[in-house]
């Protein structure tokens, strides 16, 4: 059959000449898991996606330290509504649920694998169904879908959505290295944090790139410009850096810093107006 006949039949004769070889792109690494032991001795298995450009395939030190911070004083989350941003495995959310939070929304980028992995961690925790809810969320976007997950169980066992409720507690663990997203994170705190006394956003982080620590800390300038109060409340030196062999000051790489972001009195009063 002549080449012209091939073209007439819709076959250009090139076959797979321009197709990428099967091994052209490296395969996505398989999912992994890590464990975390609570103060009670309970061991949580934390599944992670094999790889994500949003870094959801790591269990960050900030997540472990926030979890410990909640365990040290359970009243920080007991009976409260909690939203975790950029959660990955969602360890702080699981811990909050175990400690008696009323409702926890564990959120990360709306990638199917990430959300399904968060759901798997909730399911395997065993007793958090109806308490911890995974959601896909892009920082700075409309928070209404997150707020819609705040529910209260009545004495009859029926769940009733409470209009106008926001989150008592926000968790931001190891998110500040995404410098371009600081404004969007501040927007979400503004929109999602309940405007009442006692509401707080816990921002824990390590400067994994020590030479850019000033850019990590610039997040707090952004939230101060919005009118929030900022206070450092915690610091812990880990035994070793999360990533072996990274350049820069090892002591900074081992340090987890914890800050609280709260509403000032004048903005609380403005919210009541």
Labelled PLM ranges:
Residues 1-273:
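S-adenosylmethionine-dependent methyltransferases
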């Amino acid at each position: 059959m002549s080449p012209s006949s091939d073209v007439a039949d819709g076959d250009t004769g090139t076959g797979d000449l321009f197709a990428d070889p099967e091994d052209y792109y490296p395969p996505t690494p398989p999912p992994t898991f890590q464990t975390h032991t609570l103060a009670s001795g309970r061991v949580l298995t934390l599944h992670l996606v094999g790889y994500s450009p949003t870094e959801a395939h790591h269990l960050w030190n900030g997540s472990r330290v926030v979890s410990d911070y909640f365990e040290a004083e359970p009243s920080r989350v007991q009976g409260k509504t909690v939203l975790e941003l950029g959660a990955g495995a969602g360890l702080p959310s699981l811990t909050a649920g175990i400690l008696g939070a009323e409702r926890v929304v564990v959120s990360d980028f709306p990638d199917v694998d990430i959300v399904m992995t968060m759901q798997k961690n909730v399911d395997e925790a065993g007793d958090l169904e109806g308490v911890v809810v995974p959601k896909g969320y892009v920082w700075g976007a409309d928070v209404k879908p997150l707020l819609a997950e705040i529910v209260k169980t009545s004495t009859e066992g029926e769940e009733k959505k409470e209009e106008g409720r926001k989150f008592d507690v926000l968790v931001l663990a190891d998110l500040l290295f995404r410098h371009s997203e600081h404004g969007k994170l501040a927007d979400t705190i503004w929109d999602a944090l309940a405007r009442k006394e006692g509401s707080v956003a816990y921002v824990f982080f390590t400067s994994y790139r020590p030479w850019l620590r000033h850019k990590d800390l610039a997040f707090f300038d952004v939230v101060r410009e919005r009118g929030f109060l900022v206070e450092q409340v915690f610091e812990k030196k880990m035994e070793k850096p999360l990533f072996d062999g990274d350049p820069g000051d090892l002591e900074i790489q081992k340090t987890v810093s914890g800050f609280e972001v709260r509403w000032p009195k004048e903005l609380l009063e403005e919210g009541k107006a």
